[in-house]
Amino acid sequence: MAGLLQVRDALALRATSGAQLSQSLATPLPLVQAMLDRLTAMGKVERIEQDDGACLSGGCKSCPQPRGAARCSTG
């Protein structure tokens, strides 16, 4: 199970959603959500709301894959 610092580091490296963090860290989603809420309250991370088609990394302009492609790591 992941700790608070592992969640913070994984978020910094991957910039992914809570569900993806939960899966990659093998930690229950409610616990990951609670950790993200705690990190937000501490000012260590900032919640960014994105629409469904938005790129998580902001690298879509340079991404060789079409936007929304299954293998694209940025879309």
Swiss-Prot record:
Iron-sulfur cluster binds at residues 55, 60, 63, 72. Keywords: DNA-binding, Iron, Iron-sulfur, Metal-binding, Repressor, Transcription, Transcription regulation. Gene3D superfamilies: Winged helix-like DNA-binding domain superfamily/Winged helix DNA-binding domain. Pfam families: FeoC. One of its GO terms (molecular function) is iron-sulfur cluster binding. Coiled coil: none annotated. May function as a transcriptional regulator that controls feoABC expression. Belongs to the FeoC family. This is Probable [Fe-S]-dependent transcriptional repressor.
